[in-house]
């Protein structure tokens, strides 16, 4: 293993970046065009292969042979729903080779096929050459970053891309981890720090929450949108100008690919200008049918065109916080990554969401990931042990792990791609009165119902003292060590009685092929699962609203404050809805929502009147009850039909 300098490479979906640690600091290296980030584009022409800026600059003339977005294909199967959906938007051709996607291009007059990792390796070769030109010596070692949600196959294929490009890949590390390292957050003294990484790049948006303690990174949650980024903001501007061109010149340029591409390039430039100025001008000579297009756009107009997209970025932030079981006040550091976080409006929205907290943005957001990777590369070089280098590829759980709860629902305790070793505990309760025991069934998989997942093992916890349903508290703990061996235990809190099971990697676990298939299936079915989940939540929402409203108007405290007529109006409507619910347990989500709207139409005016007359209502607004514990069913023969476990919020 050569000991030359090691570089850190951020292999991005739309742009890549390379850095090196030398003379005690990180240097981000500019390419031959003077740009510190390089487009992740590879183009094939009848005479040459182009990589980076040169490839992106000629995409308008050569769309079918210019490959980008290879990162969206790497480590995936051709039939994967994600691949199938993306293919509809790509101008280049993707074919299946035994279920693996391959890219078909015409190069020097003949048809050629490449795997995604071969395209990524070409981008890596370019990044390697950029570093070599700057350092004046050959580079062999690199740390390459991947998104936190990449599975084992995507990580392995990224490593393969490095190998194909002639690099010895020291480590594959998560992008949010690299960004946190860039800011030295792992070096801050004191107790554990909760770090939120907000990464809005060219084509993807990722939010990650990490907990860092003593240099150990624990990934708590990830959320985001794999199809939101700078390109979407450009497209809004492009559509705005296509409409303006139509108004001014009565010509529609939308079908002319080259004109649209030239406009898009100008829009991307204008967007960058608007991050530092309040106005940008666009000047394109002979855009369409000889017409020159000279115009301008203000920052305010740009913000208005993208208002919904900007605001929408806060949803994944909230989801990541929920998944990490964290309140926004508990976040110590917020790190901005990705060029789109330079947009002032984006910064302001995020800062306001965190009640004015300072954001970490002193490192160029395009470069933060490569910066951290370079720091990691420097420290990895000192580590000769092959085991340690390879461990990083395997130190996550490839599939979610959980137990079956009421109604055959998969309740996840450990999400897929959680770094191991890890330990999670959750409290459950019984499903029926005087239930003597519970059956704990351990599953792995990504589907909403356990019947679609893989059963790893099961055990019973008996001798629970007789009690009404929902009273006993059973604490279930999943503990996975560094070798992937899992102990699942259940303890009855009142008696301290315990039982457990050990599940090793090989016994009952899935092979790599199976894991790939399952994760793909899960993505394919995710939409169905989400529809099912939404349906159940709409039904539960309607049910609790109706029951709460009923008990609210029947409350003794309201006597004399609500007329009998109003009271009966609400009760009749609630009873009508409850009886409709009994008959329609499997209705569609919109039917439940329609019923809820109808019910609200009756209730809201009356409740509002109450508020105005009384300045408030006992017990607050009836708006969906807080959930109780999730229930665990008894073992067969235990007086309940199968294992139905209820979760505790």
UniProtKB/Swiss-Prot annotation:
Region feature (Substrate-binding domain (SBD)): 394-509
CDD domains hit by this protein: ASKHA_NBD_HSP70_HSPA1
Region Nucleotide-binding domain (NBD), residue ranges: 2-386
A molecular function GO annotation: ATP binding
Biased composition (Gly residues): 616-627
Location of the region described as Disordered in the Swiss-Prot/TrEMBL record: 613-649
Gene3D superfamilies per record: 1.20.1270.10, 3.30.30.30, 3.30.420.40, Actin, Chain A, domain 4, Substrate Binding Domain Of DNAk, Chain A, domain 1
Keywords in alphabetical order: ATP-binding, Nucleotide-binding, Stress response
Entries under InterPro entries matching the protein: ATPase_NBD (IPR043129), Heat_shock_70_CS (IPR018181), HSP70_C_sf (IPR029048), HSP70_peptide-bd_sf (IPR029047), Hsp_70_fam (IPR013126)
Pfam families named among the record's database cross-references: HSP70
NCBIfam families: PRK00290.1
Similarity comment text for this entry: Belongs to the heat shock protein 70 family.
UniProt remark on domains: The N-terminal nucleotide binding domain (NBD) (also known as the ATPase domain) is responsible for binding and hydrolyzing ATP. The C-terminal substrate-binding domain (SBD) (also known as peptide-binding domain) binds to the client/substrate proteins. The two domains are allosterically coupled so that, when ATP is bound to the NBD, the SBD binds relatively weakly to clients. When ADP is bound in the NBD, a conformational change enhances the affinity of the SBD for client proteins.
General function of this protein: Molecular chaperone implicated in a wide variety of cellular processes, including protection of the proteome from stress, folding and transport of newly synthesized polypeptides, activation of proteolysis of misfolded proteins and the formation and dissociation of protein complexes. Plays a pivotal role in the protein quality control system, ensuring the correct folding of proteins, the re-folding of misfolded proteins and controlling the targeting of proteins for subsequent degradation. This is achieved through cycles of ATP binding, ATP hydrolysis and ADP release, mediated by co-chaperones.
Protein name: Heat shock cognate 71 kDa protein
Native organism: Ictalurus punctatus (Channel catfish)
Gene name per UniProt: hsc70
